[in-house]
C-alpha cells in the first residue's frame, strides 16, 4: 500500500521501502496480539503463533516486531520523518483503540451499526488508509491529494471488513484460511450479527441472545440459519458496494492521470471480491 501510494505521484523512493517494511511489521504485531486476545487457532491457514509456540512467546514476538518497525522508521529522510512518525504513531494508537472497542463489544448486548463502523475504521481501515497516505507523503503529494487517498483507503477498509465478516460466516474454509464461524463462536458483534439483531423477527432475536449465552454445540449453524432468514448476506453485499462507491469517489478526485490510478482500482477489486 505504501509503495502504491508513493508510485501514484512519483517514482518509488528508498524511504518508501523502509516505511512499507515498518507498516508490515506493525501489522503483523497487531495480528499476533489480536489472535491471542481472540484465542484464534488459525491465521492464513496455519497455526497462530500463540497456538504453536505459546502465549508468552507470541507476546514477545509481537513486541519485537513493533520495536523493529520503529527501527526501520528511524532510517528515513529527516525532511519527511516528522510527518511520517506523526501519522504512523497516530494510526498505531487508533488501531489499539479499535481492538479495545472490539473486545468491549463482545460483552455488550447491543451495538449500533454506527458504533461498529467506528470500531472497524479504527481497527482496520485507518491502517490501510495511513499506508497509502504515508506513501503519498514520500512521493511528494499535495495535502488535498494525500487526503483523498487516505479517504479512499479508509472506505475501502470498511468494505474489506464487510467482506471479511461475510467470509467468516459464509466462506469456504479451504479458501478462507481461518476458522469459519470464529466470530460467531466468540460472540463478536460483526456487521452480520448487528443487522440480524436489528432485522430479525422477535423470536429469532431471542434465539440469538440465547445462543450467545449458552454456546450449544450447533451454535454456528443455528446462527447462520438466522442470518439467512434475515437476509443479511444480501444486505452485506449492498453495504459493501456503498463503501466501494465512496472509496472510488475519492480515488476519482485525486489529480493525477487516470492510468496511474489503475493499480489501485485493481487492488480494490481484489480486496472486496476475495474469498480468503
Model-predicted segments: where are they?
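All-alpha prenyltransferase/terpene-synthase fold signal
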Residues: 1-276
Amino acid at each position: 500500500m505504501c509503495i502504491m501510494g508513493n508510485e501514484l505521484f512519483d517514482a518509488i523512493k528508498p524511504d518508501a521501502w523502509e516505511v512499507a517494511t515498518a507498516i508490515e511489521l506493525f501489522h503483523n504485531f497487531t495480528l499476533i496480539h489480536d489472535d491471542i486476545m481472540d484465542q484464534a487457532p488459525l491465521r492464513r491457514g496455519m497455526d497462530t503463533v500463540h497456538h504453536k509456540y505459546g502465549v508468552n512467546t507470541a507476546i514477545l514476538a509481537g513486541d519485537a516486531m513493533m520495536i523493529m518497525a520503529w527501527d526501520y522508521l528511524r532510517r528515513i529522510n529527516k525532511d519527511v520523518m516528522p510527518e511520517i512518525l506523526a501519522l504512523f504513531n497516530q494510526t498505531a494508537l487508533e488501531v489499539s483503540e479499535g481492538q479495545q472497542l472490539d473486545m468491549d463489544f463482545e460483552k455488550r448486548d447491543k451495538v449500533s451499526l454506527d458504533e461498529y463502523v467506528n470500531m472497524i475504521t479504527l481497527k482496520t481501515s485507518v491502517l490501510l488508509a495511513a499506508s497509502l497516505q504515508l506513501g503519498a507523503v514520500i512521493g511528494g503529494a499535495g495535502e488535498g491529494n494525500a487526503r483523498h487517498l487516505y479517504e479512499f483507503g479508509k472506505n475501502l477498509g470498511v468494505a474489506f471488513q464487510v467482506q471479511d465478516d461475510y467470509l467468516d460466516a459464509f466462506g469456504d474454509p479451504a479458501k478462507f484460511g481461518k476458522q469459519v464461524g470464529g466470530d460467531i463462536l466468540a460472540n463478536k458483534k460483526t456487521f452480520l450479527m448487528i443487522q440480524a439483531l436489528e432485522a430479525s423477527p422477535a423470536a429469532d432475536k431471542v434465539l440469538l441472545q440465547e445462543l450467545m449465552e449458552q454456546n450449544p454445540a450447533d451454535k454456528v449453524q443455528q446462527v447462520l440459519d438466522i442470518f439467512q432468514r434475515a437476509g443479511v448476506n444480501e444486505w452485506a453485499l449492498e453495504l459493501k458496494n456503498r463503501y466501494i462507491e465512496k472509496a472510488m469517489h475519492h480515488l476519482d478526485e485525486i489529480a493525477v492521470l487516470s492510468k496511474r490510478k489503475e493499480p489501485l482500482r485493481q487492488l480494490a477489486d481484489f480486496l472486496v471480491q476475495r474469498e480468503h
